[in-house]
Amino acid sequence: MKKNAFYAQSGGVTSVINATAASVILESKKYKSKIGKVYAGKNGILGALKEELIDTSKESKSSINSLKSTPGGAFGSCRFKLKSFEENKKEYIRLVEVFKAHNIGYFFYNGGNDSADTALKIYKACKALNFDLKCIAIPKTVDNDLAVTDC
């Protein structure tokens, strides 16, 4: 069954983070049988928690392509660190509610170490809540300090 994707930016934005966004959006279109719309989170994972999703399918291909040379974070960013599932189960339940409401089955989180940690926490929580979500951490760092990115 076709599922939608959720993409969000996190941490300090770099000069190329929007190029990654454009690539995720454009590449997703190549998998029409698996991926429907790509929603972008307004201000990172907070966009999912607040259900502030940007439907990128409403944008033209040229508009998405222009992201490749647009500095800053087009969708906004955050430095919001999720607590563990045990400490704040309610937050994870909220994420699953939003993902279900928008038929989201893919989560792309673009950021550094904390963002990769967030993607892992969300994956584990979704597994515990019996919700199938493919979580992909997309590395981005100004400091070139990504640790333990291979599992």
Residue ranges: model-predicted function:
Residues 1, 6, 30-33, 65-69, ...:
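Solvent-exposed alpha-helices and their adjacent loops that cap or buttress functional pockets
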Residues 1-52:
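N-terminal phosphate-binding or glycine-rich loops at protein starts, especially the Walker A/P-loop
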Residues 4-9, 105-114:
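A short, small-residue-rich loop immediately preceding and capping a beta-strand
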Residues 10-12, 41-46, 79-80, 112-113, ...:
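Short, ordered loop/turn segments at secondary-structure junctions
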Residues 17-18, 50, 118-120, 147:
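Short glycine-/acidic-enriched loop or helix-start segments at secondary-structure transitions
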Residues 20-24, 113-133:
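Short Gly/Thr/Asp-enriched flexible loops that form oxyanion-binding sites at enzyme active sites
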Residues 51-105, 114-115, 138, 142, ...:
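Glycine-rich oxoanion-binding loops at beta->alpha junctions
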Residues 123-149:
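Short, acidic/small-residue loops that bind anionic groups at enzyme active sites
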